[in-house]
A protein has these predicted regions:
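N-terminal glycine-/serine-/threonine-rich phosphate-binding loop
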Residues: 1-49
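Short beta-strand segments at enzyme active-site cores
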Residues: 11-13, 47-59, 102-103, 135-137
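Short, active-site-adjacent cap segments at secondary-structure transitions
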Residues: 18-20, 55-59, 111-112, 141-143
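Short acidic, glycine/serine/threonine-rich loops at helix termini
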Residues: 22-24, 59-64, 114-118, 147
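Glycine-rich loop at the start of a catalytic domain that most often binds anionic cofactors/ligands
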Residues: 55-72
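Ligand-binding beta-strand-loop-alpha-helix segment within the catalytic cores
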Residues: 68-141
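Conserved small/polar residues in nucleotide/adenosyl-binding loops
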Residues: 145-151
């Protein structure tokens, strides 16, 4: 077990399988527990950065699709719907603990460009100073390359 007591900043990665059931529907119990633990760490003075996958999986559930899409336009459509749903849920759950969250969607182009990357880093630093939990994800709606690869954890 990691001792978080000596850490000031904690980065947590949550994947689709952590956030959703195989049906694509939200795993409410698990997400509620995670938000409670992260809120407690935040209230103890820790800076929390949340890297969250799950947009496509949430979109599959929200759209009641029978399975995860295989074609890129359908994956992107599911991601567009799912990202809204995912952030709505995070905002709702964290607000119960009076914690504000922010969405930061990244692409390979942003991360590889030094000036754009610096803007993102500056934004994250300012959000943390304001007591906000930044929630980062790759922008699956426009990141074509990412959708054709098996992993979703590049952010």
């Amino acid at each position: 077990m990691i001792d978080f007591t000596k850490k000031k900043r904690i980065v947590i990665k949550l994947g689709t399988s952590t956030l959703t059931h195989k049906t694509g529907k939200l795993n409410i119990r698990r997400m509620t527990n995670l938000v409670q633990v992260l809120s407690d760490l935040h209230n103890a003075g820790k800076e929390i950065l949340l890297v969250s996958s799950g947009a496509i999986g949430m979109g599959v559930g929200k759209l009641n699709l029978p399975e995860r899409p295989k074609d890129t336009p359908s994956k992107q459509a599911a991601a567009a719907v799912g990202q809204c749903e995912l952030m709505h849920i995070y905002d709702d759950m964290f607000s119960k603990y009076s914690i504000t969250v922010a969405q930061i969607l990244l692409t390979k182009t942003i991360v590889q460009n030094p000036e754009r990357r610096q803007h993102v880093q500056n934004t994250i630093e300012r959000l943390l100073q304001l007591g906000v939990i930044p929630i980062l994800n790759e922008n699956d709606t426009v990141s074509y390359t990412h959708l054709t690869l098996p992993t979703t954890s590049r952010v």
